[in-house]
Amino acid sequence: MRRIITLIIILTNYISIANAQNNWYEKYLSCVNDSDVHALKTMIEQWEQAEPESPDVYAAWYNYYIKLAMTDVVALTTTAPEDNQEALQLMDSTGVVAGYMYGIESYNDSILQIGYQKLNTAIKLFPDRLDLPFGKVAMLFRQQLYSEVMQEFRNVLDRSKKNGNRWLWTLNQPLDDGEYILKDSMQDYFVQLYDAGQSDYASQLVEWMLQLYPTDIIFRANKASLLAIAKRYSEALPIYLSIYEDNPDDIIVASNIAHIYYTLGDKEATLKYYSKLLQCGDSEIEGLAKQRMKEAKSW
């Protein structure tokens, strides 16, 4: 009976602690997007006094300093902003566009570094909290600090080998499928790196992932795609063929194989793989396959 009573007390205390953590986090969420940074600071200070060892307090401080460091600056230039950002066009007396005015983000680096120090401490103390390094990566991407992004990825992947992808998230909630979350996140980051023109870093990330998951189709396809884009067809083709062998229903892979053979001028292989796409269910790919087969037959 004493053991049962003790267990009930422990569970009750645990539930009370969990509820307290949730309450503080909810209070934080209610004011984090408010423009009043002083109120946010006061709230985090109170939270820290109540839960000084909480990784979420460290994360809250990080977000506070990021918020404090960011300012919007008005840019006046003769070139249009990138990434389809909205801008006010300035016309000259003849009605011709003479310039553009738009807002850009600016950061106070000294304040930003305080935020990074807070988060670095949290990452060191709580290495299984995956949201912490990913939160840092988000800001590093915005600053275009890609070498530092890659270092965070390396640290995360090294940790994954130690913890078996048993990751935690906000409020120390365990992730149900840590391996899937890791892979899916790294795939998103791969796309971000490539879209940012960082193909070398994108390639490095793929190599790291394949060292851990050599049979993963998505990262094998990423590697083959990067090689094909670089016109290194002799290296890309065997990878695509091995993926196709594992997953013959992948019409994108089949299309890439057919395209490489078409580019290399291999008539027999071009006809073979494009013929597999004539009834793939994608009208655009089917149309291209018919056109390419017609061309190949005339070689």
Regions found by a protein language model. Name each.
Residues 67, 142, 195, 229-230, ...:
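Register position in tetratricopeptide repeats
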Residues 189-214, 271-299:
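Terminal, low-structured helical/coil segments at or just beyond the last alpha-helical repeat
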Residues 174-246:
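Alpha-helical adaptor scaffolds
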